[in-house]
Amino acid sequence: MKHYSATLALLPLTLALFLPQAAHAHGSMETPPSRVYGCFLEGPENPKSAACKAAVAAGGTQALYDWNGVNQGNANGNHQAVVPDGQLCGAGKALFKGLNLARSDWPSTAIAPDASGNFQFVYKASAPHATRYFDFYITKDGYNPEKPLAWSDLEPAPFCSITSVKLENGTYRMNCPLPQGKTGKHVIYNVWQRSDSPEAFYACIDVSFSGAVANPWQALGNLRAQQDLPAGATVTLRLFDAQGRDAQRHSLTLAQGNNGAKQWPLALAQKVNQDSTLVNIGVLDAYGAVSPVASSQDNQVYVRQAGYRFQVDIELPVEGGGEQPGGDGKVDFDYPQGLQQYDAGTVVRGADGKRYQCKPYPNSGWCKGWDLYYAPGKGMAWQDAWTLL
């Protein structure tokens, strides 16, 4: 049996997109995931949660592919003037109107302070632009999620304001004291105001306060499964340190019974938690314990020290000793024919005559993107979407 490998980039690559005569910075909250980023990670074409499905039905999939563009170009600190009540989560833009849906079932992330009383927020940014501030607001006690979010629903002052932060490995990491006395579900509203431009970015972050007094863990992000995997597939959690070196690897070969989209994250989490004291996967409770659950998206990856990131590699079996997909020289399309049909695994022939395979989700969404950036072999960021065969 031969195998071929795919990397599930659970913390996806972001891009610094420089359009002619206009530079655009992009970003959104990664930990805890913003509403738009969380829905993107569920899969724009087939999100898992009812709320994200409703967002796509209301605003289309493009809003999720553009998860890093929830912004206003001329905010310049006047946020209430450019983002109307009821449209805070979508930054007042029609493209993102699905994010404004008033509902109580938006997927939320449990958060708790560490031993110092802080929580580390991680913002995924695509370019090192100068920061005027990151402001973090929280909804008032008694906020009704079934009514559109208004500015008056937020506490009048931010509970955290960051004015100096360095971009490291594509992220801003900010330690903030969490607001006191908050329990249950709330919305954190984040504003990133640039100092080198009037542009500002906005993010609704759905959270739940666990009530834990001291949390020994730092969240890195959710372990998400997009689909069932075949028996014989191997899933590997890779943990990288601040220098990008492999710190730990935990592999599990799946069998019938633990290869479903809800089962294999549970099985991998159980193995990791048994083997490692540095990293655990699961749901955090009020006592600081991390317990795996059978779910395709609810398990989070936690570490005991800052400075780590993770990814999950998936090695799929190819029955009958066959070659890696595309190994026989055949292609599904000559690029850009059939562009809207491109998905993970699609093989195309580029303008250079070479064959390229569309990468696994979440990178697969870029395969349908603008050819200036994603044309296989020649786009400015083609390697984020395609693998040369």
UniProtKB/Swiss-Prot annotation:
One of its GO terms (molecular function) is chitin binding. It is found in: Secreted. InterPro entries: Cellulose/chitin-bd_N (IPR004302), GbpA_2 (IPR041029), GlcNAc_Chitin_IntDeg (IPR051024), Ig_E-set (IPR014756). Keywords: Chitin-binding, Phosphoprotein, Secreted, Signal. It comes from the Bacteria. Residues 26-208 form the Chitin-binding type-4 domain. The modification Phosphoserine is found at residue 210. The keyword Magnesium does not apply. Residues 1-25 form the signal peptide. GO terms for cellular component: extracellular region. The modification Phosphotyrosine is found at residue 37. Binds but does not hydrolyze chitin. This is Chitin-binding protein CbpD. The lineage of its organism: Bacteria, Pseudomonadati, Pseudomonadota, Gammaproteobacteria, Pseudomonadales. The gene is cpbD.
